Amino acid sequence: MTPTTISRALAIALAMAATSLSATARHEVSPVMSASASVSQTEVAKAFDNDNTTAWTVDATLLKHPQWIMATVANPGDVQSITLTQKGATADQLRKAIEIYVTYDPMNLGEPVDFTVATDRPTGNTILKFPAKYGAHVRLAIKPGVISRTWNIYEMAIAIEAGDSVADDSGIDRSYLDTSLPIDRRIEILLAQMTPEEKMELIREGWGIPGVKRLGIPDIKKVEAIHGYSYGTGATMFPQVLGMAASWNAPLLYKVTEAIGRESLDAGSIAAWSPVLDVATDPRWGRCEESFGEDPYLCSEMGKAWVNGYQSLGLITTSKHFGAHGAPLGGRDSHDVGFNEREMREIHLVPFRNVFRECRPQSVMMSYGDYMGVPVGKSKELLKGILRDEWGFDGFIVSDCGAIANMTSRKHYTALDKIEAANDALRAGIATNCGDTYNDKEVIRAATEGRLDMTALDDVCRDMLRVMFRTGLFENNPSRPLNWDKQFPSWQSPEHVALAREMARQSIVLLKNEDSLLPLSDDIRTIAVIGPGADNLQLGDYSGKQLPGQIKSVLDGIKASASPSTGIIYSKGCGFTTDDPAGLADAVETASKADVAVVVLGDYSGHPSIDGEKRPTSGENHDLASLRFQGMQQELLDAVCATGTPVVLVAQIGRPYDLSSASRQTKAIIVNWLPGQEGGLATADVLFGNYNPAGRLPMTFPQSAAQLPLNYNFKTSGRRYEYVDMDFYPLYRFGYGLSYTTFAYSNLRISTLPDGNVEVKADITNTGSRTGDEVAQLYITDMYASVKTRVMELKGFRRITIEPGQTHTVTFTLTPYDLSLLNVDMDRVVEPGDFKIMVGGMSPDFTAKDRIKDSLGYPEGRGVTGTLRYDIPAGARYEFTITDISHNLTDGSDIVTVNVTNSGNLTDTGQLTMYVDGTRTGDTRHYELNPGQSKAITFTVPSPEGIGSPWKSLNFISRHSSIFHNR
């Protein structure tokens, strides 16, 4: 759909409406970028096509049920009216039937606006007027049974308040454009030119950062890009993230995100709200599909590859959702997690720490939840202490959509109103608000009147400007307005299409292959292809619109790959989510005619109004309680298996599912995830043996949702592990996956190097008859420690190609940090003792009884196990020195500089708190230093009277030492 302005008649009507709304405010019609509806989805574009002869039509029978239409505007702003060219509803019916929602977050509509209905006499158009409200999405919800006739909307125009006239640009000191000046100096010069309104304009969000025209501050167009450029039609769609994690191939992921970056840059988007670094520990969570899985090391390595690939083109990444968003209570999206500091630092903060310390991304998105009981949106501990002070982050923080407003009565109940919420967020360092808080008129007025914390506002503006100067955007800004219909040169390039297919192939996991049914023989006479996913491949959340023929389904792939002598017959069988059993009989008949049946089941992430489905089953706000196939899918599989025809299940899923029944009934199971546009061809490559599968599970597959939580790296229990009615073991363990060949592990060598690192080597032999990839995985277990440690932890992996009969030596290096733990004092240390070292093609076996760590290991050939005796204790040792005390003549405060040095032999964090005359003063300061590294930390001793601080003593206290200074 092309963004359009409305017809001349509508423009006249809107101008009249604007005049009646305000004598001074200016209004303009916003182009619409996209639209959706509860019914007639394919026709909804007609309500925005500048053609009064075409319409979005809702039949009278459908109006007996709730319906809706939603538009996304190209220019987010203060929406103040909607003009309808419509037929079939009276003004009174519209008053009673319609609820209008204006929102920045379509997942959280908020409250409907109060509106009036007027008819423009010259045109006959209907004008819905309401107090201006900031938003990017406008939704009309239609109550059932009020409009009695078929309703046609020929045109729907959305008016927003235009911005104020540009302030006087005379007398501006534009020396901030001088690239020879230090960046910090350029920031201060520019900041001094900005009005409070311009500072608020800089930090609002509207499909990116809008910039400030008067001062030449550039805009930054952003995109959601976790598995492809999503703000357009026809960009290359790669497998969803969880599938790419299943490849266990970080170098290949680097190439993928480099390609996504190229497609983003071509489209004029220079920042991506990606990747997701959440450690997904609950498969019920709908957003598992966006994550790299349940292990912090795997998430770290794949996350670093994602960030480095995209940033290689000079683009901006925004890692999300910081922190602990991937473990919501009960798997319910955005619910709080409530973890203690140990759990956070052992698991959920790890990928963020590793990515921010090693890749230096320019931006991060905070999460909806809380940290230690404090909403992340106001957590200085998390957003300043850990993120900035410990990890050295010096970019800008983005709020998740609506997260600042959530601190009011929407969720957290920690702020009485938006002004308090805005102040809390600014003081925590949140620079960009996806939502309507920083854009709220009262909040902006508070800034002009000094009721916002202006020091905090200046600080977040500095964060934003620092990134703009550092990336050269003032000199060369590739950002361009979004165009959802234009295709760009790199989109669907042969190289990117081939890369999408390769990543899809490498992500496929073979879970079962009884009697070596796979790969399918060329001699098979007839293949039945059955299931709702067979000819309707699902891409997952945050996917762009597709061109005709862009998506290749499994049915397409099988038809393209099967022998010319093999007949292909197809039956859908049932929908993804519907309860209609009418198609089961046809599926049974189809399967009965075939030599083998390929049944494609799984998640649905499309448009229900187009596909006739009830709802999506995976993605944001689509969480599952049962982990069972929805609708009639399980009944379809049962019926097809009952025919006696050998069944291959293709699980097209965005999370682990309960495959217990399927594992008993089918001959073979492959998981192709949500495999991207080339997924059908890639799946057929595996089915017919044109590619030897080597994907490995990035998440544990339980026997039942009743086992949850069930992660491979659990901690030992004081009592029994099993239930009365179910044992403890998963159905398919983390790291698991089969191949069409076999591998044998041998000759484990473990040696401690002079620098304290540990070298681990193992030999892997391809003992089968086909070339294949093996994913060698290194796990360690700390056998005895001063605190409880995890049963096992992944510490390395390599994906390697080995020819038949060939032996490959894989080498890993463990650092002292890899062997470390957080002791009872939360200090990171290496405790001398025994470590079990295990290398294999999946996570190790264990017996869920007493002495569980002793039972860890592999069956003969499946992996190798050894013991490392490590006798080198390690830990940080911090030394503190007051190096300077200076007086601030402006406010009378004293600035105290404390130098912190790590003279130990291990990287660790620490905290330092200042006490002035025995009273704690200011925020606790965090640090994380490598051995031999120093950091200068400044503290401010305030002066109550502004004439000098009368303090007598200063005491700086860390966890284990203090430094005292008398005046």
Role assignments for model-derived ranges:
Residues R26-N75, K87-L94, A118, E161-A167:
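Disordered, acidic Ser/Thr/Pro-rich linker "stalks" and the adjacent N-terminal cap
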Residues H65-P66, A74-S81, Y134-A136:
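Extended extracellular/luminal ectodomain segments enriched in beta-structured repeat modules
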Residues G77-A89, L140:
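A short beta-strand element within beta-rich, extracytoplasmic domains
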Residues A91-P106:
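Short, surface-exposed beta-strand/strand-loop-strand elements in extracellular ectodomains
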Residues A118-P122, R799-H808, E860, Y927-K935:
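Short proline/glycine- and polar residue-rich coil/turn motifs
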Residues A141-S148:
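Short beta-strand-plus-loop segments that form exposed binding edges in beta-rich domains
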Residues A167-S820, E831-V839, S843:
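Glycoside hydrolase catalytic-domain context in secreted enzymes
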Residues P816-P873, P944-R967:
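Terminal connector regions
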